[in-house]
Amino acid sequence: YEEFVRLAADARVGGMLSGKAGILNIHLGDGARHLDLIERVVHETEIPVTQFLPTHINRNSHLFEAAVSFAREGGCVDFTGNEDIDSWEKITDEVRVCTGIRRLLDAGISENNFTISSDGQGSLPRFSPSGQYEGLGIGKASSLLKEVRECVMREHLPLELALRAVTSNPARILKLNTKGHIAPGYDGDICLLHKDSLLLHTVIAKGRVMVRNSVPEVRGTFE
């Protein structure tokens, strides 16, 4: 516990000195303690709840309910996108992202207090239809748009609200001051979507067209 407090305090001071967010991005597991350690720090020290961004909050239903309580106290929470949630729902207790966001909103949580991430292209277990572990895949960044589409098409949330979870909210929380908005002085990062399907039509990164008419124009990792 003391080491965790020290890490949180050091990150906070480092953020202040460097002009960066200085938050702790906490990867949560399946354990029954949920967010207990984070909540203890918030209640027993002067470190604010905004110092933490717990992720994987939708990995099971009991962890998600704990995350709802955490968000009620002003905490920000991060969902992990999953392009194969239809299969995962059959064999795990994972909470579908769009369902979780609807639940947060119905609980009175601010639309500013949640984000969606892909786990940074991290490892993602693969299972057979019977639930047997088959190996590791990759948590794809494309899951972000998929989750936004489900928020709109499955839960009928306004597009502008769903987009906050992958644009302005993470930019604000991480203090990425040139990201998250289309405005003078911001990076020219824009995605154009087909009106009905919300599939990608055009991608512009820092003013450069990367995808046009759904066809990539830039393919190299470092281009």
Predicted stretch roles:
Residues Y1-E2, A32, I91-C98, I138-L145, ...:
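Electropositive phosphate-/nucleotide-binding environments in soluble metabolic enzymes
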Residues I182-E223:
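C-terminal cap of metal-dependent C-N hydrolases
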Residues D106-Y186, I190-L193:
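His/Asp/Glu-enriched, well-ordered alpha-helical/loop segment
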Residues A71-R72, V152, Y186, I204:
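Alpha-helix boundary recognition
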